[in-house]
Amino acid sequence: MTWLVLLGTLLCMLRVGLGTPDSEGFPPRALHNCPYKCICAADLLSCTGLGLQDVPAELPAATADLDLSHNALQRLRPGWLAPLFQLRALHLDHNELDALGRGVFVNASGLRLLDLSSNTLRALGRHDLDGLGALEKLLLFNNRLVHLDEHAFHGLRALSHLYLGCNELASFSFDHLHGLSATHLLTLDLSSNRLGHISVPELAALPAFLKNGLYLHNNPLPCDCRLYHLLQRWHQRGLSAVRDFAREYVCLAFKVPASRVRFFQHSRVFENCSSAPALGLERPEEHLYALVGRSLRLYCNTSVPAMRIAWVSPQQELLRAPGSRDGSIAVLADGSLAIGNVQEQHAGLFVCLATGPRLHHNQTHEYNVSVHFPRPEPEAFNTGFTTLLGCAVGLVLVLLYLFAPPCRCCRRACRCRRWPQTPSPLQELSAQSSVLSTTPPDAPSRKASVHKHVVFLEPGRRGLNGRVQLAVAEEFDLYNPGGLQLKAGSESASSIGSEGPMTT
């Protein structure tokens, strides 16, 4: 019996050691149609740098971001994006595409980003970009574009960023923007092309938010006075497209490629432009002063009634009815813009864009709003309180006057003026001097006087032969009559007699 138990234990140990094949519990990993040598990660498909001359035949349907850059693609099949109904970004840069063709993007209605940069495209036809109604960013820089169809971008209603730099374009229509909607367009890069003629009135009529993102540097622009004044004003207003690339704005002084001069550094070329009128090129923006917490109303003033009105906020947000995403800005039925509670975020440039069949061209109106905090209001002046306070102070002063003891003046600290009740020492001195005086008064006064003045000499003063001298101590105290002494001396006023009383 024991050996059976040992045998069963040994068999269990052998089974555990051998294990079970993986194929029973875990099926082999599915490849999800991932092309050969490509990398598939969730909704990302990267086939970059593989030297592909054609697009892979099978692409995963869950792909949202497709990267086919740095290959050798020369053609794109019509409808090749039909299985990719979730596609949002397509990277076709650094290939050898020289043309697109009709229907290439017809099934990419959800595409947001299309990168066609660094190819060899020479033209864009009327239907090359059909089907891209949701496209927001189109990169076409570093190609060989020479011609753009008049309606090449007609179907791109949501396009906000268009990069056409580093091409060979000699002209561009700023009037209709080749079918683009100026309501959404925020960035238009036309730098490093061959633009030799630009309509200044068309430039001036563009919305302010598009001027801020219009890049025209490194083009052989003409040294035109009106164009110079316009770009100079943009530079002074701080538009980033001009301010950030001011050193790269050049113009041809003598219509020769070798005569390029820098717009903002060599102003001698435009010395004669001071008399050229620069007014009327742009409609001046209106400056508004708003206080935090107050309400603000902006109106889109147009020459004739407009069919459609849209606004662009300082944060580059397109505003249509009912208003902004956060609800702080409302667009009303008449096209006006209302802010119920102004905050610091509402400071900046608000642009109104009006379109309609009766308007010869799109009209814009600009408001430069500055937001300030309200000053604290001063407290109201309380006359009742001040009256009560004045009465209390007056009562205290009256009580002090009636019941407070008189001021005992110190001779050095307090100098109070009091009329003396007794004759002062100076008065006594004056009286004695008048008594001792030998000058007889006038005759009438002697007759009128019936009084006799008698002076008795002290016994100790008899040896002075009747001569007395008035002397004042060094520290003469005006308020101590005892400090005044009569001294004998040789200089007396007069000598009248010796011992005995003297009568005068």
From Swiss-Prot:
Disulfide bond annotation, renumbered to this chain: C34-C40, C38-C47, C223-C251, C225-C273, C300-C352
Molecular function (Gene Ontology), one example: protein-containing complex binding
Cytoplasmic face of the membrane: 405-504
Coiled coil: none
Keywords: Cell adhesion, Disulfide bond, Glycoprotein, Immunoglobulin domain, Leucine-rich repeat, Membrane, Repeat, Signal, Transmembrane, Transmembrane helix
Polar residues: bias regions: 424-440
A Pfam family per the record: LRR_1
Subcellular compartments: Membrane
Membrane topology: Single-pass type I membrane protein
Transmembrane segments: 384-404
GO biological process, one term: heterophilic cell-cell adhesion via plasma membrane cell adhesion molecules
PROSITE patterns documented for this protein: IG_LIKE, LRR
List of glycosylated residues: N107, N272, N301, N362, N368
Signal peptide residue numbers: 1-19
Family: Belongs to the immunoglobulin superfamily. AMIGO family.
UniProt name for this protein: Amphoterin-induced protein 3
Organism: Homo sapiens (Human)
Gene name, Swiss-Prot/TrEMBL: AMIGO3
